[in-house]
């Protein structure tokens, strides 16, 4: 499965790339203008078409998990260790060790992850592509990846760039004396840039806060082009108190609490140094996206001095946090807490801090005869002045083993957060312990039901008296909580019966509880009488109930179809479900159920595409599911919007037939905001009501083209078959065991 992500506007995404591409004039003569140039408000469907399998040079049959499992990972680690201390003349290693450089590479690759939409992270190795490869915060990481190219070249398809970069960060830490928590492979590479909304700014380092001073959702970085926060302080203001607020908000949106945040910063800044030998504005050239072809994808060429080594310029900040930057020590915390720090400036003019009693005690990274003072960023000093962070720092300083474990676990979380549940992890170094942020599931201690059991359970469900539309809504609500951006949610675990999902407004809690009670009664009755060791989970029963209702609706339409069903889901407990962590999965809009909160800033149609992209759907799959769910009367809140049929509950193509019927004229309702009325063109009689999501399948030229296929006289059976296929896909989105088997 490939991750799919949507930006707030493709125009904005293109603008960020274009402003880096200084060598090519925007819309040069002869270059085609996209439709977005002429009509920026048109519905953009490109998020449903990116990461197409045809873009993958390994082909559609390539199985990365199978390839990775053939890898001699110890041999890879050995090659990484050799690379760490083999300094290259074209980019010399600080202190003779690339370890800190590679830690930064891995950190910045994973650190783009954000909880609100699950986008970003190490998966896909997006750091290779624009805009991330040209962000100011990723300056010179192009060299880190080039240093790793011989290893990637050697092992080819057996290890992805995403896995290699994270593994290299781990090996770097271990080579410098730190014990990591573990490593899981499984990050498949992307082959093109993601469409991600990184902020409204049109230039790098612009503030990502809204007019009220709040960091815009779903963003996590405080300024355009940064991974987290500005190390000099908010917008370059060296205010440690304000910086602490930024740190807490940014890291919190990346799923880190105060302890994890402190551990990550303190652990990471134990190693390496910052680079600000001179002013970036005067010395440094274009980022990779704006460099000439002769640069071969490298950027930030430095014309001052040698342009490398002692003359390296990255952030403009200069210096190290400890006197031993290539070994794990407690010096960062000791230095931070025990010195009085005063504001100063780097040789490049950047705000940073030095001890009040500064001495030249830090070895030079390239000349053993030189020494320098210690330094700290404003964001480091923030950890000392903020009461909560300071208390944690002092505790870690007094208890080094606690600090080591906290850093190891926080680093593991940082680099694995977007990999999804533990079932997706590959390799022998996966920790045995389950962590709450992995959304753990129990192991089934029983045998799975067989075909005869499935048939009997479907019979019992359909005879239970639960309305078929409610069975469909419950199954959809359970499975469609999945998001392909970070592989969270889904039907496995039956977390729809647990907090917080059981109280989400979109799930109609009152109706949901009745359906779940009926299904639980069927489950207990079935399991109680078994003597053969077979049991059925509620998670399986929820999906089976929806599938049985779909089959019944297809029969009403005249088609005898069998919805594929694979048992194997289990039931999670409330203790295995972090309520706050799952809260960010709550939909504020679901076009498939015609649900939309007016507090949303984006349109219902845009958010439908966003949701479809998180469900890994194509344009035809999204289209057939919307039409089918309307026919099945599966709207949230029992809404009649878009139910363009006189036979709800029948799996018909009526939605498309009636939407495209020219005898109907659509107008905005004068009494209900966000509602449209379809009236008979001749008589004016009201026939239907619909939402903007419904009408976009007739107004968008691309969606209308697909809708016409399903509205055609010869499309009845195709519609049913395609709906069943798309439905089954959604039901199985989190069945990683099926994809591996």
Swiss-Prot record:
Binding site for heme b: 269
GO terms classed as biological process: cellular response to hydrogen peroxide; hydrogen peroxide catabolic process
Cross-link Tryptophyl-tyrosyl-methioninium (Trp-Tyr) (with M-254) residue location(s): 107-228
Residues annotated as site: Transition state stabilizer: 104
Enzyme class of the recorded protein, top EC level: oxidoreductase
Keywords (A to Z) from UniProt: Heme, Hydrogen peroxide, Iron, Metal-binding, Oxidoreductase, Peroxidase, Signal
Gene3D superfamilies tied to this protein: 1.10.520.10, Peroxidase, domain 2
GO MF term set: catalase activity; heme binding; metal ion binding
Active site: 108 (proton acceptor)
UniProt keyword annotation of Oxidoreductase present: yes
Protein modification: Formation of the three residue Trp-Tyr-Met cross-link is important for the catalase, but not the peroxidase activity of the enzyme.
Signal peptide annotation: 1-28
GO cellular component: a single term: cytosol
A Pfam cross-reference name: peroxidase
EC number: 1.11.1.21
Positions bearing the Tryptophyl-tyrosyl-methioninium (Tyr-Met) (with W-107) cross-link: 228-254
Entry superkingdom: Bacteria
Note on cofactor: Binds 1 heme b (iron(II)-protoporphyrin IX) group per dimer.
Reactions the enzyme catalyzes: H2O2 + AH2 = A + 2 H2O; 2 H2O2 = O2 + 2 H2O
Assembly and oligomerization: Homodimer or homotetramer.
Family to which this protein belongs: Belongs to the peroxidase family. Peroxidase/catalase subfamily.
NCBIfam families per UniProt: cat_per_HPI, PRK15061.1
Function of the protein: Bifunctional enzyme with both catalase and broad-spectrum peroxidase activity.
Protein name stated in the entry: Catalase-peroxidase 2
Gene name as annotated: katG2
């Amino acid at each position: 499965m490939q991750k799919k992500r949507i930006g707030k506007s493709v125009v904005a995404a293109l603008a960020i790339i274009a402003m880096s591409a200084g060598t090519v004039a925007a819309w040069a003569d002869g270059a085609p203008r996209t439709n977005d140039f002429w009509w920026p408000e048109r519905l953009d469907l490109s998020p449903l078409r990116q990461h197409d399998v045809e873009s993958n040079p390994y082909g559609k049959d390539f199985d990365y998990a199978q390839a990775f499992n053939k890898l001699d990972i110890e041999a890879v680690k050995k090659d990484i260790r050799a690379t760490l201390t083999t300094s290259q003349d074209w980019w010399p290693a600080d202190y003779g060790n690339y370890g800190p450089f590679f830690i930064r590479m891995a950190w910045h690759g994973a650190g783009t992850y954000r909880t609100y939409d699950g986008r970003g992270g190490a998966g896909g190795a997006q750091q290779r592509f624009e805009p991330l490869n040209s962000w100011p915060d990723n300056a010179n990481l192009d060299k880190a990846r080039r240093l790793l190219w011989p290893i990637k070249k050697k092992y080819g398809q057996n290890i992805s760039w995403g896995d290699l970069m994270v593994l290299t960060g781990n090996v770097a830490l271990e080579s410098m004396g730190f014990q990591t928590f573990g490593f899981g492979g499984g990050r498949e590479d992307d082959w093109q840039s993601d469409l991600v909304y990184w902020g409204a700014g049109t230039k790098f380092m612009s503030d990502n806060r809204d007019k009220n001073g709040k960091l815009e959702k779903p963003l996590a970085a405080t300024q355009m082009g940064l991974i987290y926060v500005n190390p000099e302080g908010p917008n370059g203001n060296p205010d440690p108190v304000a910086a602490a607020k930024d740190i807490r908000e940014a890291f919190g949106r990346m799923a880190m609490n105060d302890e994890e945040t402190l551990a990550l910063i303190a652990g990471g800044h134990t190693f390496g140094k910052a680079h600000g030998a001179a002013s970036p504005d005067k010395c440094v050239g274009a980022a990779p996206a704006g460099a000439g072809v002769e640069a071969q994808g490298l950027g930030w060429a430095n014309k001052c001095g040698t342009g490398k080594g002692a003359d390296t310029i990255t952030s403009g900040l200069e210096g190290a946090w400890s006197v031993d930057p290539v070994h794990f020590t407690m010096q960062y915390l000791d230095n931070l807490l025990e010195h009085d720090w005063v504001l100063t400036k780097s040789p490049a003019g950047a705000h940073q801090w030095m001890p009040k009693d500064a001495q030249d005690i830090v070895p030079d990274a390239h000349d053993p005869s030189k020494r320098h003072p210690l330094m700290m960023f404003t964001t480091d000093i923030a950890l000392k002045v903020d009461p909560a962070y300071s208390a944690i720092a002092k505790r870690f300083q007094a208890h080094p083993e606690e600090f080591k474990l906290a850093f190891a676990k926080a680093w593991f979380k940082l680099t694995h957060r977007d990999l999804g549940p533990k079932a997706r992890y590959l390799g022998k170094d996966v920790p045995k312990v389950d962590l709450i942020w992995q959304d753990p599931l129990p192991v089934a201690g029983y045998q799975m039901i067989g075909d005869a059991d499935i048939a009997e359970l479907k019979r019992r469900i359909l005879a239970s008296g639960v309305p078929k539309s409610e069975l469909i809504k419950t199954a959809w609500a359970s499975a469609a909580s999945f998001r392909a951006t970070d592989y969270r949610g889904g039907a496995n675990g039956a977390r729809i019966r647990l907090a917080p999902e059981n109280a989400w407004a979109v799930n109609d809690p009152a109706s949901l509880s009745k359906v779940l009670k009926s299904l639980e009664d069927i489950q207990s009755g079935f399991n109680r009488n078994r003597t053969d060791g077979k049991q059925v989970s509620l998670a399986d029963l929820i999906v089976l109930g929806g599938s049985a209702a779909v089959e019944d609706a297809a029969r009403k339409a005249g088609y005898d179809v069998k919805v594929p069903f694979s048992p194997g889901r289990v039931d999670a407990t409330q203790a295995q479900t972090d309520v706050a962590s799952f809260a960010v999965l709550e939909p504020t809009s679901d076009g498939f159920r015609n649900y939309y909160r007016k507090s949303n800033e984006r349109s219902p149609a845009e958010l439908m595409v966003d949701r479809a992209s998180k469900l890994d759907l194509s344009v035809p799959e999204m289209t057939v599911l919307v039409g089918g769910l309307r026919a099945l009367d599966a709207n949230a809140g029992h809404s009649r919007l878009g139910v363009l049929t006189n036979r709800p509950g029948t799996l018909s193509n009526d939605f498309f037939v009636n939407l495209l019927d020219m005898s109907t004229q659509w107008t905005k309702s004068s009494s209900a905001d966000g509602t449209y009325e379809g009236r008979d063109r001749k008589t004016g009689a009201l026939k239907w009501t619909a939402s903007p999501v419904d009408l976009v399948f007739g107004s968008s030229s691309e969606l209308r083209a697909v809708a016409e296929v399903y509205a055609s006289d010869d499309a009845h059976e195709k519609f049913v078959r395609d709906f069943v296929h798309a439905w089954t896909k959604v039901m199985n989105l989190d069945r990683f065991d099926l994809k591996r088997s």
